[in-house]
Curated annotation (Swiss-Prot):
Name of the molecule in the record: Polyphosphatase
EC number annotated for this UniProt entry: 3.6.1.11
Function: Polyphosphatase (polyPase) involved in the degradation of inorganic polyphosphates (polyP) that is able to degrade a range of chains from three to several hundreds of residues in a highly processive manner. Exclusively shows exopolyphosphatase activity, cleaving inside the polyP chain.
GO biological process: polyphosphate catabolic process
One GO CC annotation: cytoplasm
Catalytic activity: [phosphate](n) + H2O = [phosphate](n-1) + phosphate + H(+)
Family membership: Belongs to the PPase class C family.
Pfam families: DHH, DHHA2
SMART domains referenced in this protein's UniProt entry, alphabetically: DHHA2
Sequence positions that bind Mn(2+): D41, D127, H148
Keywords: ATP-binding, Hydrolase, Magnesium, Manganese, Metal-binding, Nucleotide-binding
Binding site for ATP: H149, S286, R381
Any GO MF annotation of the entry: metal ion binding
Amino acid sequence: MSPLRKTVPEFLAHLKSLPISKIASNDVLTICVGNESADMDSIASAITYSYCQYIYNEGTYSEEKKKGSFIVPIIDIPREDLSLRRDVMYVLEKLKIKEEELFFIEDLKSLKQNVSQGTELNSYLVDNNDTPKNLKNYIDNVVGIIDHHFDLQKHLDAEPRIVKVSGSCSSLVFNYWYEKLQGDREVVMNIAPLLMGAILIDTSNMRRKVEESDKLAIERCQAVLSGAVNEVSAQGLEDSSEFYKEIKSRKNDIKGFSVSDILKKDYKQFNFQGKGHKGLEIGLSSIVKRMSWLFNEHGGEADFVNQCRRFQAERGLDVLVLLTSWRKAGDSHRELVILGDSNVVRELIERVSDKLQLQLFGGNLDGGVAMFKQLNVEATRKQVVPYLEEAYSNLEE
């Protein structure tokens, strides 16, 4: 980078060093946050958006400069949970980003407590198009959105407001800033490992769920990388397939995790509203191993289910859903496990079974825990959540 610019780790370290009076500007504290699963895509999108906005503000891309105005990238988990994301840790190490330079939930709470009275908290949302439930008491205004999930039609006055189909939200974030920063080569080189890591993971190395936005982002990255052999070699990006394999192996490594760790590693929680009855508190955990592996690692089916029920109680959930996925011999496989009140479980499953092509292989609907093979392997949590929400909204009292 030029001597007047900061790299991503330098930018984050600089933010950490500033007093709150310098971070909050004109009685406004601004953050950028992904969704509560805090996966590679959410973390990469939040850091990239905040960093690129800093470069934009400090540069000559617009007459409307906002030097000294910062967006703080927030990772929507406790600091201690970052270690569960071994793929993210690997990519952060590539960029020489230290854990202590990152901002987590604890940091957001501290910032909110220490700003002067009357300071508003504005947020850009990435990999999400509504305020995360756990942050609703902190965020006053949503001022921008870039996301690739189902459009909830909220915060319609946000700017930018980009909600469109994409394999990875990071692709949308990158393309947005690539254009605003006029293809700045230095910036692309600086954020390439973060962006490519997220895009390659979300698209299975550009083989599945690839959209034009993903192709464009990768093409733009590779066009810059191809002219920087030494930098590319230093970052380990000469072979994107090898880079993907390294990340994927770490993402799939959950050996030694407790059941609670596995459930919260990639977790989202929702409140569904139904016809004339109370809301349904539902949590969904995406897991990279099949149920038989989980049983073998954690004392058998009964012990594993008991620990899931404990997690369910601790989170105040009416329903807990586990979505397992893995690949074998080039084929994708999925399972869906649901725990909760037997009547609610039965009603939900009856309404989504055809869409997800569910086949019972364990438990039973009357016992409040049922396990299914999910033959519709294209349906990820991104599709399962709207299916379940629609099913609950149609339940009669």
